[in-house]
Amino acid sequence: MSDSQSNKQNQGEDDNNVSSSIESNENYPFRLNDEESEPQSSTTESMLKAKKQSWRQVLMLGFSSLGAIYGDIGTSPLYVLNSIKYPNSSPTEEDIYGAISIIFYLFTFIVIFKYILIVLFLGTNDGEGGQVAIYAKIARSLKIGPKGVHIPGSPEKTDLELLARAETSSSFKSSNLFLNKASGFKTNPKLIKFISKFILFGCFFGCSLVMSDGLLTPTTSVLSAIAGIQIANPSFNDVLAVSEVVLIVLFLIQQFGSNKISFTFAPIIFLWLIGLIISGIYNIVKFHPAVFKSLSPYYAIQLLKHSGIDVFSGAMLSITGTEAMFADVGHFGRLPIQLTLTLFVYPALIICYLGQGAYIIKHPEALSNPFFYSIPGGLNSWIYWVMFVLATLSTIIASQALILGVFSITSQLINLDCFPNFKIIHVSKKYAGKVYIPAINWLLMIGVCATTAGFKNSNNVTAAYGLGITLDFLVTSSLIMVCMTYVYNWNILIPITYALIFLPLEVIMVISNLKKITHGAWFPLMMSGIFMMFLSFWRWARSRKVNQDFKTRIRIGDLYPELKKQPPQSETVDLNDRGRPMSIVNSSNEELVEYGVTLPKILKTNNNQLKVQSKFGLMNLKKYDGIAIMYNDSSVHTLNSPNTVPQVYGKLVSSFSSIPSVFIFCSIRVLSIPTVPNDERVLIGSMKIPGHYRCIIRYGFMEEILIDKELNNHILNSIPDINELAIKFNLNNKCILTKPCTIPILHIFENNLIRSHDYSSEEHETKNPLVKCKRFIRKILINHIFSPIYSDFQSNGKFLKISDEDEESEKKMFLGGVVRI
């Protein structure tokens, strides 16, 4: 399992530290002794539950969010008023009132009412935002998520309870919802099937739009910021070259993490917004106090009558960055964003727009550049140059929201198995949502630099800007209405009311921006289409691979027929007090119970005479003294499928009929806490097969995934079979936690080659050219795109630390075959 794979399972599930007994009933058949006791709360469980933010943290995060989220929406006053289409070349007082009125109501309805009061309350999932979060929330509620994936936020039994299961009726069932056909239209199976496809499409399309916006926003912001230098120095002609350098620097500093970057940028945006407030108040008081009339919707309606819906293509630039704000929830939290935007950013921007309107009414000639002309003191004053510098810096910072948004949604897509397993770096111990993805950062940097070189100047980019953002608004509204209906089970009238209020406005904004397609808006649409196709292809290929994994898992009873009717082995525990050195050899049962070591009830079957079903019939399974640890890429199989073993294990025992006397199936999980205490890191559960165990090794999201000799000893000292092995190897009391154990250990990793179905047999022969073409494309995509990328992210045992090369070659084994999907 690679570092990136470890982060895929980054999820916060409650874990109990049981060192005494597990209640013996039909759900929990394993127990340490006959006495029942209540599970004790572990440190891990307490840390998982302690996620509430103090007011001090809220205020600090709110301030930090200024430097990461509001640069885009906060710099809109630079260009919005002069981007709006007016009925006359020289707008009248009513025209200016109308423009400000449209900006005010657009901002209030979309940003405040829709996102702050509705979407941020209903659409977040497990502390994350964006369309992926809404999708995950709906999929979790309807149980229609990707097969074999734990959706963040799902209530689930503890690792300990899951390891304790010996029987399950769902090992080979999909996670689809079993609906009663008579339960009404809302839960009709056909409708649910449509909903599952619709929300996945919406999720992928919305993410693709954000990613394409991630190419345009940095390009727009940096080009416009550097072009501003020409106002002070008209002879400056190196806008493109300087912009490329600034962009490269901007992406280079992302490795320091959103925590440091946002806190560094926050004072700049804070001063910028303060400057907007001062400038706005000054212009209102001095030039036209009656500008507050523009807050009446009458003037917005009048401007729409005279100019049509094309007004929205310019006015919507005042709300760019809103969708990125929603995607960035994981970096700062919902409440800090809501408070900062509502109480500070929103008033500052509205006051600034009112001030610009007041100035233009008295100075119509200033419409070409209303922001700089309306700065108190006039051009070349010291206030002008202060605001000029702040405007340049703030505009550069504006791209930060989209960059962080791309990191957030990519991280969520990886966790849902909808994206290649890129390495995720958590940059904060306190907040799991603050992530940095190096590969995405460098790919985004290359894409943005190429986009900047292609568009060359800010005017060309601005002409292409806006369509993707308005489509994103529409996608979010569609998903949030499904969320209202199926997650919150609200009356159908509520989503209908929501649709009547917001959808017409968003559809109008989309229509008003369609004219931009010929002026460059085709580019974000094209990039969205490319991203959409890749996400859909990856999800399709991964679903085929997961289905194949489930299909090829082997039932224990089929592999070992004599175990079909055997009772389960008994205990599952975690390693309590793991910091103390202990030897299992010569220890009494009472001592083992005290240390929380697994105590399986040995089956009546003779461990050395177990028969295995092979292609040659039943054969005796021979066991030699030693230990094998087989690593699974996902803990899902290890936890949720106690009746089965991986296909590669079946191949091993049925082909060679000889395995080590102790066999451990091991998986690694990453929890949504920064660190896991050493005494709660490892959980061991016995299996039906004598001498076989299931093991979960747990890490926090800030910890390096590393298995060394000491951790191996932690695992081995919890297995009773180690007692007999230690005696055979004359170890006596030497196999203790503080020293490396010398019992031979073989580490087995699954390494398969993914290939497309061959379709070469007679039953698959066809003369249909379309079918042949489809199969050829399928083969190219799977064999030459999916398979190489998938192989790059397989673990290959990188997390297993063996310093000596010769020892590594002896102790690591890679088993697999060709997997056809």
Curated annotation (Swiss-Prot):
Residues 1-47 are annotated as: Disordered. It is found in: Membrane. Belongs to the HAK/KUP transporter (TC 2.A.72) family. Its main location: membrane. One of its GO terms (cellular component) is membrane. The chain crosses the membrane at residues 58-78, 102-122, 191-211, 239-259, 261-281, 307-327, 341-361, 387-407, 435-455, 464-484, 492-512, 517-537. Pfam families: K_trans, K_trans_C. Glycans are attached at N460. Residues 79-101, 212-238, 282-306, 362-386, 456-463, 513-516 are extracellular. NCBIfam families: kup (TIGR00794). Major high-affinity potassium uptake protein. InterPro entries: K+_transporter, K_trans_C, K_trans_N. Residues 1-10 have a biased composition (Polar residues). The keyword Mitochondrion does not apply. It comes from the Eukaryota. Keywords: Glycoprotein, Ion transport, Membrane, Potassium, Potassium transport, Transmembrane, Transmembrane helix, Transport. Residues 1-57, 123-190, 260, 328-340, 408-434, 485-491, 538-821 are cytoplasmic. This is High affinity potassium transporter. GO terms for molecular function: potassium ion transmembrane transporter activity. Residues 17-27 have a biased composition (Low complexity). It is a multi-pass membrane protein.
